[in-house]
Regions:
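Expand to "…catalyze enediolate/carbanion chemistry for C-C bond making/breaking, isomerization
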Residues: 1-264
Length: 264
């Protein structure tokens, strides 16, 4: 491990011990994570007993799921589940593409993150056979705002609180666990606290860090620590890929020189 990775471990230890961090996030979807960097992340998080949550590219991203199994993630999240049929496709993949003993060790969540998904949520909660294969739902507030032609600053509004409360109440009636994500920051403390007080969420998440619902009681420092971890992670990635780039640039220069000489 290098100096940056040891610093990441220090931040993660603080997040785990003092801030209520319970999982670390990664994405094949918007983040476009590569297997090499995910194996490094898994090495770091495993040393501290923090499991990885992986967002896959879609409800039928079979290759992503197989990569999740190879890494050994604790939870898989499917994005943009907007209709009962999308939920069915996700449940079908879980049932038919993942061995039961593997599936038993993984929590399967899906994201409700568009106004279309919200409008169809009651119908999705009526799909009992498909719900049997999933463990929970996370609301992605930034994409939800975008689907409503709203700025991300709207995510802590009363309108969004009403949407989240109604969605989570329906999910709770079906025994699902509930998570909140999307522009989670110090400004979200009251929003999170109100949902937690009603017993409607189990966790909330920043871009890279997942907290237990009651972690909001630790105050603003948890969000600063989450940002610090993300910063160290990005610096670690930059260090690795900068090294690869330098190696490739040296090789490119040599090949261009050799090709130029052969044409003369």
């Amino acid at each position: 491990m290098n100096e940056l990775e040891y610093k990441m471990m220090d931040v993660l230890k603080f997040l785990r011990d003092e801030c209520g961090c319970v999982q670390i996030k990664a994405e094949f979807e918007a983040e476009g994570a590569r297997m090499s960097e995910l194996m490094r992340l898994k090495d770091i998080t495993s040393r501290l007993g923090l499991p990885i949550v992986m967002k896959i590219g879609g409800v039928e991203s079979v290759t992503d799921v197989y990569n999740c199994l190879q890494i050994g993630v604790a939870s898989i999240v499917a994005p943009m589940v907007e209709t009962p049929y999308a939920l069915h496709k996700y449940a079908h993949m879980i049932e038919h593409m993942i061995a039961p003993d593997n599936a038993a060790d993984i929590d399967f969540f899906f994201n409700m993150e568009t106004i279309t998904g919200y409008r169809n949520f009651a119908a999705m909660m009526a799909a009992e056979a498909d719900l049997a294969h999933v463990d929970g739902v996370t609301i992605g507030r930034v994409d939800l705002a975008g689907s409503m032609a709203l700025d991300r600053s709207a995510v802590d509004s009363e309108e969004f609180f009403a949407i989240c409360r109604e969605t989570f109440r329906m999910a709770r009636e079906k025994g699902l666990r509930c998570g909140l994500g999307g522009a989670i920051s110090e400004r979200s403390v009251e929003f999170i606290g109100r949902l937690a007080a009603e017993g409607l969420i189990d966790k909330f998440e920043t871009r890279k860090v997942v907290f237990a619902a009651d972690a909001v009681e630790h105050g603003p420092r948890i969000f600063r620590a989450a940002l610090d971890f993300e910063l160290q992670w990005l610096k670690s990635k930059r260090r690795f890929y900068s090294g690869v780039r330098r190696e490739d640039e040296a090789r490119i220069a040599m090949l261009e020189q050799r090709l130029g000489a052969s044409r003369e």
